[in-house]
């Protein structure tokens, strides 16, 4: 049996540091990378993608509501098409950075309130 160890990374914000992310990328199989709406920024996404590539870690988008003040934990009432657009925008941001590194986003794992709504 193969087990996929997965971790949310790149969540640079006033709430979190990314100083341990490089160490975590030595032990995980897949990384959910914050896409800038609740946390993270493009330089951080690029750094995590580069280290993931080096370590053979698959890259996933970790989209959220545009809610940095609450770290994406506050529910925002959007209709289904607005939620799809929100997720796709963040996927596209991460995918563009991944492609610059000759990588692809392989999965999407929602964050915070968005993930709670998906459950």
Which residues does each predicted region cover?
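A short alpha/beta connector and helix-capping loop motif
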Residues: 13-46
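Hydrophobic, well-structured mid-protein blocks that either form specific transmembrane helices
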Residues: 99-119
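Active-site beta-loop-alpha junctions enriched in small/polar residues
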Residues: 8-12, 34-38, 64-68, 111-113
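Glycine/small-residue-rich loop that forms an oxyanion/phosphate-binding "nest" at active or ligand-binding sites
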Residues: 68-101, 107
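N-terminal basic/disordered segments at the start of proteins
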Residues: 3-17
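Hydrophobic faces of well-ordered beta-strands that scaffold small-molecule active sites
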Residues: 3-7, 31-33, 59-63, 106-110
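Short, charge-patterned binding micro-sites
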Residues: 57-77, 109-114
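Acidic (Asp/Glu)-rich catalytic clusters
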Residues: 22-26, 47-60, 99-101
